[in-house]
From Swiss-Prot:
It comes from Citrus sinensis (Sweet orange). Keywords: Chloroplast, Plastid, Ribonucleoprotein, Ribosomal protein, RNA-binding, rRNA-binding. This is Small ribosomal subunit protein uS8c. One of the primary rRNA binding proteins, it binds directly to 16S rRNA central domain where it helps coordinate assembly of the platform of the 30S subunit. NCBIfam families: PRK00136.1. It comes from the Eukaryota. GO terms for biological process: translation.
Length: 136
């Protein structure tokens, strides 16, 4: 785990999905909880629960991933995640310039002045912000 918590979340979920793991354990912060709420609401993950370790009182989120199989049987990852804005290069858009991912099939997660939200919610509220990641 590094200093970029969003990149850590994305990497953990992507690695677990590619290795066909059912669950992922990530550190719990305000940002990670908000991103996980969006993933739950949009249906990219099945379940999320908070876990507290008794030894050192650290809080973790345990995510249950949603998997998909093709008709012929081979495994196909359901999540494609891409980190856009990073600590070394912040990327901001106003609400008119927020990109659409696969014509609305994917989502863009933004950090706005009103909290972390999806691209659809930001367009409805007519506010822009920092583009955190793309998920499709």
């Amino acid at each position: 785990m590094g200093k970029d918590t969003i990149a850590d979340i994305i990497t953990s979920i992507r690695n677990a999905d590619m290795n066909r793991k059912g669950t992922v354990r990530i550190a719990s912060t305000n940002i990670t909880e908000n991103v996980v709420k969006i993933l739950l609401r949009e249906g990219f993950i099945e379940n999320a629960r908070k876990l507290v370790e008794n030894k050192n009182k650290k809080e973790f989120l345990v995510l249950t991933l949603r998997h998909r199989r093709n008709r012929k049987g081979p495994y196909r990852p359901i999540l494609n995640l891409k980190r856009i804005s990073r600590p070394g290069l912040r990327i901001y858009f106003n609400y008119r310039r927020i990109p659409r991912i696969l014509d609305g099939m994917g989502i863009v997660i933004l950090s706005t002045s009103r909290g972390i939200m999806t691209d659809r919610a930001a367009r409805l509220e007519r506010i822009g912000g920092e583009i955190l990641c793309y998920i499709w």
